[in-house]
Amino acid sequence: MAKGKFERTKPHVNVGTIGHVDHGKTTLTAAITTVLTKKFGGEAKDYSQIDNAPEEKARGITINTSHVEYETETRHYAHVDCPGHADYVKNMITGAAQMDGAILVVSAADGPMPQTREHILLARQVGVPYIIVFLNKADMVDDAELLELVEMEVRELLSKYDFPGDDTPIIKGSAKLALEGDQSDIGEPAIFRLAEALDTYIPTPERAVDGTFLMPVEDVFSISGRGTVVTGRVERGIVKVGDEIEIVGLKPTIKTTCTGVEMFRKLLDQGQAGDNVGVLLRGTKREEVERGQVLAKVGSIKPHTKFTAEIYVLGKDEGGRHTPFFNGYRPQFYFRTTDVTGAVELPAGTEMVMPGDNVSISVSLIAPIAMEEGLRFAIREGGRTVGAGVVAKIIE
């Protein structure tokens, strides 16, 4: 018997579990689907279904990720869980599963461990905006003072990486007990407290269509008597006929006006996020626009050449490099629709980067790209993907 039909009317939020190996991320994921399904409908997933994560590709990189979904009173959640540490690193850096918030799972019996720290740092670097903590395995800790000590440690660690440690919701519980239907405070009720924290602490994300207009340029044509048409997929926002827009990146920024929008050979009065459109530009010459630039709302995005980034370097077995690279390495950086060569500066004290590593680097591009913090890119050598990255901070 179906428990009511699936309502698409609830706002949709993307979350995921992060944290140290064996602290209970997958068990918690199973517990959330099992407990919430009983109350709000949907499909429960057991541990083995989640742990057996299928492979997917993002920016030329293979990642194992499990996707589950569940509902609360007010929202619909898509939740990602990864089997291995390397999958987390790849997932967060490629943005394969963009997270509006993360559930950091910390074993109350062990406290914060090296990957706890690394995942918090990664979340900061790749722009995961909110973290909620689930202090798991609370059934294994009899000493209330010890629990409090672990909680303090986690809060300090969050604050260290610029998350609001003092205000972060921390839910104490046991995913294992919750999964078994236990009704004590740390069993099922802990999962409902976690759901409430998700609903209240993570704001509803802005829909792509409500953002400021941005469209990566894929192709440029000139149509005699009508002018220049730029094609691409609108990444966010809306473009209307008559809007003043800017062409940003690679060359000096120029202003132009949208005089027409067409889709499937039909004229429209606007194009919006997700649409593949042709945008007609007034008074713009065919050679003034090229693939790799973006059309954007005036003043909303600037071109930059220098930035710091968090990158993942493909291992040899993933089709990546077979040898390390050193300071001054010059690959191509593939942003949106084009490659730009850039020079890599390694952090002080880092001699070289091995295939399979993740590392923070500084990059200087030979041409400016329309850039914002959180922008994803691939690292390529002659068209072959050797890594992936995300802009952490713009320098100039």
Curated annotation (Swiss-Prot):
Annotated segments matching region G2: 60-64
Biological source species: Methylobacillus flagellatus (strain ATCC 51484 / DSM 6875 / VKM B-1610 / KT)
Assembly information from the UniProt record: Monomer.
Region (G4): 136-139
Entry binding sites for GTP: 19-26, 81-85, 136-139
GO molecular function: GTP binding; GTPase activity; guanosine tetraphosphate binding; translation elongation factor activity
Main subcellular localisation: cytoplasm
Matches recorded under CDD domains: EF_Tu (cd01884), EFTU_II (cd03697), EFTU_III (cd03707)
Function: GTP hydrolase that promotes the GTP-dependent binding of aminoacyl-tRNA to the A-site of ribosomes during protein biosynthesis.
NCBIfam families attached to this UniProt entry: EF-Tu, PRK00049.1, PRK12735.1, PRK12736.1, small_GTP
GO cellular component: cytosol
The protein's name: Elongation factor Tu 1
Binding site for Mg(2+): T26
Region (G5): 174-176
